[in-house]
Amino acid sequence: YLPKIVEGKWSGTMCLTEPQCGTDLGLIKTKAIKNENGTYNISGQKIFITSGDHDLTENIIHLVLARTQDAPKGTKGISLFLVPKYEINDDGSIGPRNGVNTVSIESKMGIKGSPACVLSFDDAKGYMIGPENKGLNSMFTMMNLERIVVGIQGLGLSETAYQTALSYSKERKQGKSNNNSNGETDL
């Protein structure tokens, strides 16, 4: 999976939040039922998934937090699963569509160029990443880095807005000069 993501042929998401629990991940309901072949059937809904569905890449690899059948309650019972939008054939080619569906597009106030959606996992084939019930640790390694990236985005946008406003204020003419000349004065 990783080489295709690094090449830009596939993209990835992080699927944490659910409609009923917001930031309290201990309350997630997404289920992971183990199959005889070691894969899992993932069922549940996730919200606020950035770039959760698009046709810019051949496949989207979702990292999904879910609970196995006998998982402890709370955050100690959460595991991490890799769930591709399209299943992967044995030869590495794209296979049939997995049970990952877009329910809706989220309405946002900011960062309009970064769409977010609601995803439904309907018995989607998934693969456990890392040890069972330790998924939150792995996910938050990525989340902490993403928080820094979002902060840097905000800094870049605010710096651009400031530089644009400063440049405009230096060229904008406003009203008459106070020294009784007939020319306009800078803002």
Regions found by a protein language model. Give the residues of each.
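A short core secondary-structure module
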Residues: 39, 43-97
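Amphipathic alpha-helix face/heptad-repeat signature
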Residues: 1, 151-154
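Active-site lining segments that contact anionic ligands and/or coordinate catalytic metals
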Residues: 9-11, 27-29, 37, 59-61, ...
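Internal maturation/activation junctions in enzymes
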Residues: 1-30, 34
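Structured core elements
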Residues: 13-16, 29-33, 41-43, 48-49, ...
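Short Gly/Pro-enriched turn/cap motifs at secondary-structure boundaries
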Residues: 20-23, 53-55, 72, 108-115
